[in-house]
C-alpha cells in the first residue's frame, strides 16, 4: 500500500507541475480500450500522436503562451492526420514528424556549449531508456498476473483483444509518467552531475579503438581501389556510415570524460573522414545506378547528407555546435518526409528507370507505347540472357512503383503493365523450353486476386472434420516420382487415414478438371491459363462420397519419356466434409 500511496502522491505532484502533459497522457490512453480492428487506422491516431503531444509540451515549457500553442498544435496535427488519405501508421509525414520531435526532444534545450549539449542529450536518452524499461517490466508483470488469474480461476483473460490493449495502455501511460519523474529528479540534482567510470571505459578503450581500426581498414580499402583502378562496391555505404556515426558519437561523448584519450586522433577525425565520405557517396551512387532509388535508399541519402554536413561543420570552430547538428537533421527530415516523401521520390526515379529499360529492350512502338509484340507466345523464347535480366528488373520495378503511379498507368495502360509485371515468371521462367523437366505451380483455394465467390454446397454432407495437415503424393523421403510408378501416373489412388476417418481419392479427378476447362493435363500452359482451375482442383471428391477441402495444392510438370504432364505433388488439407 505504501508503494501505491507513494506513486499516487508522485502522480499528484506531476499533475501540478506538468498539467498539460499529464492531460495529454490521460486523454490519449483513454482511447485505447475503444480501439476496434475495423477502424484501427482512425482509432489509433490520438494514441500514436501521444509522443508528439508530449514532446511539444516539454519543448514549449516555460515559454509564453506555451499551453495555448501546444493545444492548438495538437488539434492541428490531429485533424491533418485524421483527414489524410493514407493511414497514420503508413504515412511518411507522421514518421518524419515523429523523428523531428524525437531529435528536438532528446537535444532540448539546444545548449550552445557543446559539453552541456551532450550532457543534456545523454541524460534525456538515459531517462527515456529507463522509462521504457520500467514500463516493459510492468508489462511483463501484468501478463504474469493475467496468466495466473486465467490458470487459477479458469477465466479467459489472455484474449487477443485484452492483452494487446493492456500492454499498449501500460507502455503509453507509464513511459511518459516515469520520464517526468526522472525529469523532476534531474532538475533537483542538476549540479551533482557525475558520469560513471563505465562510460569512460567504453569510449576510451572500446569505441575509440574500433573507430581507429575502421579508419585504417577504410584507407587500406581506398589504397586497393586506387591500385587496381576499380570502383568501390555499392555495399560500402553500409560500412562507412556506421563508422562515421560511431566516430561522431565518440567525439561528442569525450566532452563528458574527465580523462579523455586519443585526443590527437579526434583532433583530425573530421579531415580523416573526407576520404571515407567520398567512398560513401560513390557507393551510394553505384547502388542507386545499379538498383534504382527505393525508400530505404532515399533515407540513406538523407543520413549521408546529415553526416557530410556534420563533418563539414566540425572543421570550423564557429560551426561546431551540436545544436546546429540537431537543427540541420530536423530540416533534412522535414524536407524528405513532410515536404515530399521517400516513396514519391523513389517512384519518380523508378519511373525514369522503367522507361529507360523499355527503350533498351526495344519494346516501345513509334507512339512510345508498349508494343503488342510482347503478347506473342514465342516472344519470350527469343530473348538473350542479358534481356532476360532486364525483364527481371522490370518485374521488381513494376510491382513496387509503376502500377501505383497514375502517370505510368495513364501513359502505358493498366492491362499492359499487369502483363509486364508477370512477364518474367509467367513467360520467361515458366514457359522457356529449358524448364520442361521441372515446372511447379501451386493452386490456392483462397486467392484475393480472384473475384469469384467461394461457396461450397454442404447439403450432401453430414459432418465437417477439421484436418489441418499436409499430405504428399508418396513417401516423404521420395520426392521424385519413381520410374516404376510412371506407368500409373494420372491413374493413381491416394488413401488417407486420420484418427476419425479413412478416405481416398483418385488422381484421375485432376485430369477431368483440366478436360472440363478445355485443357489437356499432358500439355504445358502458362500460369495465367492454369490458375483459374484452383477452385475445382482444391475441392476433391472422395470415393466414400465425401469432399476434401485443400488450402493449397502443388503440381509439377514432369516428363518421363512419352508420359508427361502436371503431376500431383501434395497439398494442405483444411477440412473434410463426410457423407
Curated annotation (Swiss-Prot):
Keyword Electron transport listed: no
So where does this one cross the membrane? 13-35, 39-61, 66-83, 93-110, 130-152, 162-181, 201-223, 238-257, 264-286, 296-315, 324-346
Is Transferase included in the keywords of this UniProt record? no
Identify the GO cellular component terms for this protein.
Answer: plasma membrane
Highest taxon of the source? Bacteria
Keywords, A to Z, come to: Cell membrane, Membrane, Transmembrane, Transmembrane helix
- The principal location of this protein is membrane
One Pfam family here: DUF4153
Q: How does it sit in the membrane?
A: Multi-pass membrane protein
Compartments, record wording: Cell membrane
Q: What is the official name of this protein in its record?
A: Uncharacterized protein PM1469
Q: Which organism is it from?
A: Pasteurella multocida (strain Pm70)
Amino acid at each position: 500500500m505504501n508503494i501505491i500511496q507513494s506513486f499516487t502522491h508522485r502522480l499528484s505532484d506531476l499533475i501540478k507541475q506538468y498539467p498539460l502533459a499529464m492531460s495529454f497522457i490521460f486523454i490519449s490512453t483513454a482511447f485505447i480500450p475503444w480501439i476496434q480492428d475495423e477502424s484501427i487506422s482512425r482509432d489509433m491516431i490520438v494514441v500514436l500522436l501521444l509522443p508528439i503531444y508530449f514532446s511539444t509540451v516539454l519543448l514549449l515549457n516555460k515559454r509564453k503562451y506555451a499551453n495555448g500553442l501546444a493545444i492548438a498544435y495538437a488539434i492541428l496535427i490531429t485533424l491533418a492526420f485524421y483527414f489524410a488519405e493514407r493511414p497514420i501508421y503508413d504515412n511518411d509525414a507522421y514518421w518524419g514528424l515523429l523523428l523531428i520531435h524525437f531529435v528536438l526532444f532528446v537535444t532540448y534545450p539546444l545548449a550552445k556549449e557543446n559539453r552541456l549539449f551532450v550532457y543534456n542529450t545523454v541524460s534525456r536518452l538515459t531517462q527515456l531508456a529507463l522509462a521504457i524499461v520500467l514500463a516493459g517490466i510492468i508489462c511483463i508483470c501484468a501478463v504474469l498476473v493475467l496468466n495466473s488469474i486465467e490458470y487459477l480461476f479458469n477465466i479467459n483473460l489472455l484474449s487477443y483483444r485484452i492483452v494487446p490493449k493492456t500492454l499498449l495502455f501500460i507502455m503509453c501511460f507509464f513511459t511518459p509518467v516515469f520520464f517526468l519523474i526522472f525529469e523532476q529528479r534531474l532538475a533537483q540534482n542538476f549540479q551533482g552531475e557525475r558520469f560513471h567510470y563505465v562510460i569512460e571505459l567504453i569510449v576510451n578503450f572500446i569505441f575509440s579503438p574500433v573507430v581507429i581500426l575502421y579508419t585504417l581498414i577504410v584507407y587500406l580499402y581506398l589504397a586497393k581501389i586506387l591500385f587496381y583502378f576499380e570502383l568501390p562496391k555499392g555495399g560500402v555505404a553500409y560500412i562507412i556510415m556506421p563508422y562515421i556515426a560511431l566516430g561522431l558519437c565518440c567525439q561528442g561523448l569525450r566532452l563528458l570524460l574527465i580523462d579523455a584519450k586519443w585526443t590527437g586522433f579526434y583532433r583530425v577525425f573530421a579531415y580523416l573522414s573526407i576520404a571515407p565520405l567520398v567512398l560513401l557517396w560513390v557507393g551510394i551512387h553505384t547502388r542507386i545506378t545499379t538498383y534504382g532509388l527505393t525508400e530505404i535508399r532515399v533515407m540513406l541519402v538523407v543520413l549521408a547528407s546529415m553526416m557530410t554536413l556534420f563533418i563539414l561543420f566540425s572543421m570550423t570552430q564557429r560551426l561546431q555546435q551540436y545544436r546546429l547538428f540537431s537543427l540541420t537533421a530536423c530540416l533534412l527530415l522535414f524536407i524528405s518526409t513532410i515536404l515530399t516523401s521517400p516513396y514519391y521520390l523513389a517512384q519518380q526515379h523508378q519511373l525514369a528507370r522503367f522507361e529507360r529499360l523499355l527503350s533498351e529492350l526495344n519494346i516501345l512502338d513509334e507512339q512510345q507505347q508498349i508494343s503488342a509484340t510482347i503478347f506473342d507466345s514465342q516472344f519470350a523464347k527469343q530473348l538473350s540472357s542479358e534481356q532476360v535480366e532486364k525483364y527481371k528488373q522490370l518485374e521488381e520495378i513494376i510491382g513496387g512503383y509503376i502500377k501505383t503511379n497514375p502517370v505510368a498507368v495513364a501513359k502505358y495502360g493498366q492491362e499492359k503493365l499487369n502483363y509486364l509485371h508477370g512477364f518474367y515468371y509467367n513467360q520467361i521462367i515458366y514457359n522457356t523450353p529449358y524448364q520442361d523437366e521441372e515446372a511447379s505451380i501451386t493452386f490456392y483455394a483462397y486467392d484475393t486476386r480472384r473475384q469469384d465467390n467461394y461457396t461450397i454446397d454442404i447439403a450432401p454432407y453430414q459432418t465437417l472434420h477439421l484436418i489441418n495437415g499436409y499430405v504428399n503424393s508418396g513417401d516423404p523421403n521420395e520426392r521424385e516420382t519413381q520410374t516404376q510408378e510412371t506407368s500409373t501416373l494420372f491413374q493413381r489412388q491416394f488413401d488417407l487415414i486420420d484418427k476419425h476417418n479413412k478416405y481416398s481419392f483418385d488422381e484421375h479427378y485432376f485430369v477431368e478438371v483440366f478436360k472440363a476447362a478445355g485443357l489437356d493435363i499432358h500439355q504445358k500452359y502458362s500460369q495465367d491459363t492454369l490458375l483459374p482451375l484452383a477452385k475445382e482442383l482444391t475441392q476433391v471428391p472422395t470415393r466414400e462420397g465425401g469432399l476434401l477441402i485443400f488450402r493449397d495444392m502443388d503440381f509439377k510438370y514432369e516428363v518421363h519419356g512419352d508420359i508427361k504432364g502436371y503431376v500431383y505433388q501434395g497439398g494442405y488439407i483444411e477440412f473434410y466434409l463426410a457423407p
